[in-house]
Amino acid sequence: LRSKQHEFNGVESLKRVFGSAQGKQNVPAKFVYLNDIDSEPVTADGFLTWYDARERHPTRSEYRMYFPTTSVSEKAVKGDLLVIGRRPDGSVLVVVAQGDSTVASQVRWLFGAQNFDGTGYLIRENPETEQDRIAFASRAILEAIGVDVETSQDAMLEDMLRRFHGAFPSTREFSSYARSTLTGVHHGDNGDGVLMAWMEREESLFRTLERHLIADRLVAGFGHDVDAFIAFSLSVQNRRKSRVGLALENHLEHLFLQRGVRHSRTGVTENRSKPDFLFPGVQQYHDFAFDAKRLTVLGVKSTCKDRWRQVLAEADRVEQKHLLTLESAISSNQTDEMRAKKLQLVLPAQLHRTFLPAQQAWLATIE
């Protein structure tokens, strides 16, 4: 990915994307670098230059693509995954994902390149026409690389504004509301499908309400108060991040309650740890006459990154711990480490196919 010349050789694959250059073509580009450690991607704006280095040669062509030095190119190293995407407006999105990372696995899955060995270039034309991608997982990955995905339930906006008095309700209240709008989904149905349906509905309803409330605030304006604008922007981001995790816990708790599954949510264990769910309950956990083999601890994280290790220290009496997540295509390096640490990964069945075949046999479902 990195070269002193700052150029990629224009093999036939790139010509299929950018065509035959007449002179130097400067293409607006957004550069994005992703890894599993940083909470936000590194981004930069610039241009790619596509040209024929032998344009004046009567019989030979030598196409090249020049890329500038940016904060993204400075992080890229050999072995990283590179994705070059042409947008409908002609601009380009250049994504670099750290090699062997979970986010690289996710980007591979998103573009149908899980079996790509990294040699040369793989061209995927019109990937949006592929219908085998899971909406919830795809949206999360696309937003991570800076692509906004609109999802809305505009027909429900008036009802939400009336019910919640033009403000954001508590996460528990909103989760309950989202479930109530899905009359065709019953808690007795397949648990994996039920959880995904509830989460997808809540996500689309929340984005609909959020878009309206944010628009109202922007219309009101901030005057010359830059700090107020920054604070508002941060509050939007933080609300999105915290809400998804709480929504997942809310829907799981409702599923357990409706099915009569005994549990404690955020019960206190050693060192004031608060595992998301303890089965059959925190009282049994603290009763040392109760067989530890009958205890189960379940951590819940909408996304993992390195935070999955927090679950390991939340219940000393339980040797084999469980973690439920909605994160797709977690890398083999991460799942191998989870297995070694005696952490069982649990995902809705629909997300299992985002993983490699060798990983899928180990994954557990909700049902």
Predicted features and spans:
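Catalytic core segments in nucleotide and nucleic-acid processing enzymes
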Residues: 250-253, 257-258, 263-367
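Charged, structured surface patches that assemble and position nucleic-acid processing machinery
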Residues: 44-60, 76-92, 99, 103, ...
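Interdomain/boundary linker segments immediately adjacent to catalytic/signaling cores
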Residues: 157-246
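Acidic-basic catalytic patches of nuclease active cores, encompassing PD-(D/E)XK
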Residues: 2-8, 224-273
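Short, glycine/acidic-rich beta->alpha junctions
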Residues: 74, 205, 215, 225, ...
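Accessory beta->alpha helical hairpin/"wing" motif in late/C-terminal subdomains of nucleic-acid enzymes
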Residues: 90-105, 203-216
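Glycine- and charge-enriched low-complexity intrinsically disordered segments
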Residues: 114-167
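Long, contiguous, compositionally biased segments that the model treats as domain-scale units
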Residues: 1-95
